[in-house]
Amino acid sequence: MEQIEFGSKVRVRLDPQTMDIRLETAFGRYASRAEFRPYFIDMEGERVPFSAAEQRSAVRWDCGTGSAARVRLGGFRTEKKRYALEILLQIEVLEQTGEVLFELIPLREAYGEVKKICWPQPLYVCGEERARGFTAMPMMQGMLIPDDCPDELHPFLSTRVCSTECVLPFWGSYRESGFLAIIESYADACLDYHHLPYQPARLSVQWEHSMGTIGYRRTLRVQLFETCDHVRLAKAFRAWTRSVEGLVTLEEKAVRSEKVQQLIGSAVVNTPPVLFHCEPVSSYFNKTDPAKNHEIHSFDEIAAGVEKLRARGLDRAYFHIDGWGKMGYDNLHPDVTPPCPEAGGAEAMRRMLDTMRRCGYLSGLHDQYRDYYLKAESFDEDNAIRNFDGSFYRNDEWPGGEERALCTMLAPDYIRRNYARLSEAGIEPDGAYLDCFSGIELEECYNPMHRMTRRECAQKRNECFELVRSQGRIVSSEEGCYPYVNHLDLLHHAPYVYAFMRVAGVDTPNLIPVPLFSLVYHECIVIPWSMGCRGWGTPERDCGGLHGMLNGGVTMLEFDPCEAELRMSQDLTRLNRTVWNREMTGHRFLGDGTSRQQSRSGVPQPRQPIDQGITMHS
């Protein structure tokens, strides 16, 4: 079968037999490699290469927006099995913009046959050996993988797009020139990656089934750049998402809620859990000191601590209140009311919130509508997410013990119920933190009473966020995953991915953390940063507070911070009050290493841009 060539701004050469591809422009070349070719994975886990297709046709095609190649594949067969799958693969060059679209269209398939389709295969920047090569990945805040990195790296949590290892649906590679790959059909997609020592990283999208079939068109958009770095990639993604999803800035969110305006420049302070109660099956259960499995900090005790912080000079704060429910932190969700009786109950909780308001502070409740505890009063397994094979998510890691996953289709009514009960008791927190929703991967449910696609899961999570906002509260959740940013005011954390790497035993000291997320979304959401060295999610030798300054964020403080942390917190929150509504327009490393960095914030004319030059460690 002959090769197909098409395109003018970008010249594409496709081999329909192998699906090898080459892109050429006036400034660079990008190509797949013969050792990585397309395939799909069936529901039993068997990997079936596209070469197993007994039916294959290819045509060149022209349309109003550009030129394309279409390859039709069917009749897939292995020694064990025949497959009903028939697909159309289309590669189109948009002549106006020079973008390249890779589109997968299912034409025929059987339910429950295909788990993932892995196409297109990885692309690499060709030539340009004089320049050092990098791959940019939106792992939490962002990460660069140098081509010459001596460490091996592969997925350690989940490869699903819009979860911790890929919070934004894109990646990019560059030397002098480079490319950005935008996963437009992000709801049912994974980003597979593998870096071997001293080699360019291999990244590719995997299109996952939705409710048992591929079901709909999947699109990957590739943009090519003559000069490229991580800032160029982030800004190109920002421009794309602004055009398709829009960017809701903090200024717009503050118009909808005066409490968001008060949140700007406020330190985020974690209270100790009002009640920490741990079930014996939990991995947090303390076998050597059983008394630590049931510890109380009364509402009045926390109120006294708040007054001490005010006396020490903390002028603006948002208190994240853990363990306020009847059995404390991560227990009995979603049936957490009434407020913890052992800590003083509803009356004492009202006093605590009144104290926070009197001191000029904001309050927010740590809440949860995903982890569904078997000990919850209203627990019914029929309300839990049911997987494709009929099984349930099962976990007993957290203090509340055994749990399932509450189907997100049902979550909004639990929120309405719980906050109505709190209002009836005179308890009106300024905000609510809905745990897990913006951090864990999108989920499906196969229970016919509340079937849910991953896209519907994202929509229902956003409905929960907007329900909190409609009550006049600050909306908060865990991480900065793409579907949710426009619906959130505050993240609990969005640092670098080191904390999860440490837990997983991944040792990659030669990766380079970069603020990809902040370059896209800085003026759209408030992000707190831990202060000290070895802070949560910061590089081993770096000061977390300095990364906070670089990113123009706010402080994450413990309930009894030292004086140095308080001083740094005041500096950081003052900076945040200056740059909170300004796009982060640039980031660079100063000198030969990575310890000295500079970010740049745009400001409205006639004022001049602000530079934050930061040395991370000495």
Segments from the language model and where they lie:
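Aromatic-lined carbohydrate-binding/catalytic grooves of carbohydrate-active enzymes
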Residues: 265-420, 424-432, 438-450
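Generic detector of solvent-exposed, compositionally biased contiguous segments
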Residues: 1-8, 41-57, 394-396, 510-520, ...
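Carbohydrate-recognition beta-sandwich/jelly-roll modules
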Residues: 2-319, 324, 341-343, 355, ...
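Short C-terminal domain-edge/linker segments immediately following a structured domain
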Residues: 132-139, 148-150, 349-352, 395-398, ...
